[in-house]
Amino acid sequence: MTNKDESVEKNTESTVEVTNVKQNIDDSVEQTEESKGHLQDEAIEETSDENVIEEIDPKDQKINELQQLADENEEKYLRLYAEFENYKRRIQKENEINKTYQAQRVLTDILPAIDNIERALQIEGDDETFKSLQKGVQMVHESLINALKDNGLEVIKTEGEAFDPNIHQAVVQDDNPDFESGEITQELQKGYKLKDRVLRPSMVKVNQ
């Protein structure tokens, strides 16, 4: 093969290589354009989806706002209802306490009169007039005590009971073999309670 032929062959190969390179470049450009087209399509689809979401959101947002408002109103109602119930219970309790205190003051003022009536009933006499008068006083005493008991007054138990400093007041110590140590042997003055409140402790003699 001559030098001329070799030169022609080399030129032909170079031309083929250039053609191949150009083809590769064209293919790459085409692929790039296709990829770009796909990306644009996806972007358009996403934009469309966003537009749909934006179109739906206002309605859903309004529903959510109304639901939130309803929940808040329900919570406020329940809180106010609970506060009102607590207020009613507190007022009722205060009224009961006030009634108890009012009755306590009245009954405390009456106790000395009851003591005097009971002392009068302990007086002995043979005169018929005296006995008749004493019987009338006794009836008044019983009626008064029953009325006070109906309103919560209670006589504190004493003789034979164990001494309780919450309701008893020890005035004298006793040494009586018929009673246990700490037992009350004698009541010196009656004590009274109004329900769970001590109006006046009983004055007692306690066995040592």
Swiss-Prot record:
Pfam families on file: GrpE
Protein keywords: Chaperone, Cytoplasm, Stress response
Name of the featured protein: Protein GrpE
SUPFAM superfamilies: Coiled-coil domain of nucleotide exchange factor GrpE (SSF58014), Head domain of nucleotide exchange factor GrpE (SSF51064)
Oligomeric form and interacting partners: Homodimer.
NCBIfam families per UniProt: PRK14140.1
Family label: Belongs to the GrpE family.
Organismal lineage: Bacteria, Bacillati, Bacillota, Bacilli, Bacillales
Keyword set includes Chaperone: yes
GO biological process: protein folding
CDD domains: GrpE
Residue spans of biased composition, Polar residues class: 13-23
Record-linked PANTHER family: GRPE PROTEIN, GRPE PROTEIN HOMOLOG, MITOCHONDRIAL
Entry GO terms, CC: cytoplasm
Molecular function terms, GO-annotated: adenyl-nucleotide exchange factor activity; protein homodimerization activity; protein-folding chaperone binding; unfolded protein binding
Compositional bias ranges of the Basic and acidic residues kind: 1-12
Role this protein plays: Participates actively in the response to hyperosmotic and heat shock by preventing the aggregation of stress-denatured proteins, in association with DnaK and GrpE. It is the nucleotide exchange factor for DnaK and may function as a thermosensor. Unfolded proteins bind initially to DnaJ; upon interaction with the DnaJ-bound protein, DnaK hydrolyzes its bound ATP, resulting in the formation of a stable complex. GrpE releases ADP from DnaK; ATP binding to DnaK triggers the release of the substrate protein, thus completing the reaction cycle.
UniProt-listed HAMAP family: GrpE
